[in-house]
């Protein structure tokens, strides 16, 4: 009987040592490059205060993001300025769902590389008609950077081609948006962005 009690701690020690060895062998630490890659792929919510922007809308009025941050939920849509406001399906879909957003006090800003007069031309009755939210031009002839400052700041420039990218972002009432690495992360589509801010 005494011999059996003596064996129990020995057996427990062997089991613990075996499990510990197995865990160490199967969970080998990654190299530094792999750890950096994992860190850059993490999705976290961060403030977009540093990503504030301003630009002229289709009526040449100055529109700025900052007054909405911390007060309202905001959807920012980067649409295809080359195709035009009357041809961009995501922009037209956002206009269709605008009443839902307005009922919940969600602000909407659409941004493109089109000039104010090009956006204004797309809003005529024989084309897309009016939009109930501002279409901001990402162009500043007085800036040394010139065009696409907003696109660059929000990570909406294709690194390989240098062309502007489309994308939609949902900012919560705290002024936060999802980030991957150092750039805000776009959502899959307008419907997903709308659902995320109205629920």
Describe each region flagged by the PLM.
Residues 1-54:
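N-terminal targeting signals for export/organelle localization
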Residues 54-55, 170:
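Hydrophobic beta-strand positions
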Residues 59-61, 174:
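Residue-level recognition of short loop/turn positions
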Residues 64-94, 107:
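Short active-site neighborhood of thiol/selenol oxidoreductases, capturing the structured segment around
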Residues 66, 154, 179-181:
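Short hydrophobic alpha-helix segments
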Residues 87-151:
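Structural microenvironment flanking redox-active thiols in thiol-disulfide oxidoreductases
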Residues 130-134, 152-169:
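Structural micro-motif
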Residues 162-199:
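Thiol-/selenol-based redox modules, centered on thioredoxin-like
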């Amino acid at each position: 009987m005494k011999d059996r009690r003596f064996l129990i701690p020995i057996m427990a020690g062997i089991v613990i040592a075996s499990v510990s060895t197995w865990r160490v062998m199967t969970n080998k630490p990654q190299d530094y490059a792999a750890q950096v890659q994992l860190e850059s792929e993490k999705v976290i919510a961060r403030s977009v205060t540093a990503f504030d922007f301003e630009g002229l809308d289709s009526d040449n009025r100055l529109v700025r993001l900052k007054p909405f941050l911390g007060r309202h939920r905001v959807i920012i849509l980067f649409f295809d300025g080359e195709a035009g406001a009357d041809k961009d399906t995501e922009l037209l879909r956002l206009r269709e769902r605008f009443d839902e957003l307005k009922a919940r006090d969600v602000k909407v800003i659409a941004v493109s590389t089109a000039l104010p007069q090009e956006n204004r031309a797309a809003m005529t009755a024989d084309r897309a008609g009016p939009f109930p939210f501002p279409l901001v031009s990402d162009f500043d002839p007085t800036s040394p950077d010139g065009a696409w400052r907003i696109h660059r700041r929000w990570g909406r420039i294709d690194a390989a081609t240098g062309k502007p990218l489309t994308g939609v972002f949902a900012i919560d009432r705290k002024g936060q948006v999802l980030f991957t690495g150092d750039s805000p992360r776009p959502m899959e589509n307008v419907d997903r962005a709308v659902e995320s801010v109205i629920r």
